[in-house]
């Protein structure tokens, strides 16, 4: 791992790209809190995120993408109509949707019932990261399981002192994304 690396886009895009596709994990700002990211197709990244957080795989993990085109093969059963409706439901607030998992995901990203979670993010840095790698990115809050999510670089460093980071500004959301099961329309987190 590149100890305590602090990257900025676009100037460090090659280092970030190599890190992601080498199975690396890193912290980065999201719409409301700092997240832990990695490649959802790489079991090393998934297992490292679970280890860092002290969390089991039972809950699955969230992915973020910059647009629906990046989700092809990562989610399934989401029609163009569903995509448009999800964007309408989300409005301006970050909203994560639970949908059926696609074939590209590695173990532990999907739940036992074959579902996964995806958020199409309007955050400029997330859009830039996903455009760089051409696919979704794992995204879970940068904290130990059960603890408060990190809202500053200092808080990320307190939880994960040696974790590489992509620097940037947090979005304007005051709390983590709401989560909705798209098929049942059940609100999991408001």
Curated annotation (Swiss-Prot):
EC number: 2.7.7.87
Subcellular location(s) of the protein: Cytoplasm
Pfam families assigned: Sua5_yciO_yrdC
Predominant location: cytoplasm
InterPro entries linked to this entry: DHBP_synth_RibB-like_a/b_dom, Sua5-like_dom, TC-AMP_synthase, TC-AMP_synthase_SUA5
Keyword Metal-binding: no
Catalytic activity: L-threonine + hydrogencarbonate + ATP = L-threonylcarbamoyladenylate + diphosphate + H2O
GO molecular function, one term: L-threonylcarbamoyladenylate synthase
Keywords: ATP-binding, Cytoplasm, Nucleotide-binding, Nucleotidyltransferase, Transferase, tRNA processing
One of the record's GO cellular component terms: cytoplasm
One GO BP: tRNA threonylcarbamoyladenosine modification
YrdC-like domain: residues covered: 10-190
UniProt key word Protein biosynthesis: no
Top EC group: transferase
Purpose: Required for the formation of a threonylcarbamoyl group on adenosine at position 37 (t(6)A37) in tRNAs that read codons beginning with adenine. Catalyzes the conversion of L-threonine, HCO(3)(-)/CO(2) and ATP to give threonylcarbamoyl-AMP (TC-AMP) as the acyladenylate intermediate, with the release of diphosphate.
Protein family according to the UniProt entry: Belongs to the SUA5 family. TsaC subfamily.
Protein name per Swiss-Prot or TrEMBL: Threonylcarbamoyl-AMP synthase
Species this protein is from: Dichelobacter nodosus (strain VCS1703A)
